[in-house]
């Protein structure tokens, strides 16, 4: 005894139960949609923390491109800290300065996408005419933008309920508690 019951959300640790979005499936669906819209030059600014979330999304990005027979230059894959608009702005500038610019940029979260939009618009480029963008989170703010942001909406209510249920179960029946992983599906919001 004496250990504190823990359930993590969107972070996998070997000794704790975890509840997370289906990052692999959702990123695959997002890329399938972007590719179906005619894009082949797709950049991805990913989180810098190398958590399981970052690794899963990055692997799914590469896997989806491979499944579609698309090769992208290594410089299309950039790092920026999650929710860090200044980092994202620098990486967006870098991508826009490339001689062979991407036609679509995927951001690690919707807040980052908003930072990217500001950089793109400051250059006089129109979205989606000059360049397309996509986010990941499905925040309310991202759906108030014009044009609305293509993104993956994470079912945060379901993730929270699932985590709470697992935590209550661990507290009530510690002797039968197992380290489990639960995955909650996200929803592609096409715009």
Predicted regions and their residues:
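Bacterial carbohydrate/catabolite-sensing allosteric modules
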Residues: 2-191
């Amino acid at each position: 005894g004496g250990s504190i019951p823990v359930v993590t959300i969107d972070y996998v640790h070997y000794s704790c139960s975890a509840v997370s979005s289906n990052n692999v499936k959702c990123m695959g669906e997002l890329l399938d949609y972007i590719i179906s819209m005619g894009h082949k030059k797709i950049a991805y600014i990913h989180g810098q923390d190398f958590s399981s979330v970052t690794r899963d999304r990055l692997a799914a990005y590469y896997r989806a491109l491979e499944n579609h027979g698309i090769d992208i230059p290594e410089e299309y894959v950039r790092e920026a800290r999650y929710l860090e608009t200044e980092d994202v702005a620098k990486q967006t500038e870098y991508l826009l300065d490339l001689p062979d610019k991407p036609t679509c940029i995927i951001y690690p979260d919707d807040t980052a996408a908003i930072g990217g939009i500001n950089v793109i618009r400051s250059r006089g480029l129109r979205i989606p005419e000059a360049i397309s963008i996509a986010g990941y989170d499905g925040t309310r703010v991202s759906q108030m933008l014009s044009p609305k942001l293509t993104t993956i909406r994470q079912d945060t209510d379901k993730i929270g309920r699932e985590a709470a249920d697992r935590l209550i179960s661990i507290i009530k029946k510690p002797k039968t508690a197992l380290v489990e992983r639960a995955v909650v599906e996200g929803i592609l919001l096409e715009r």
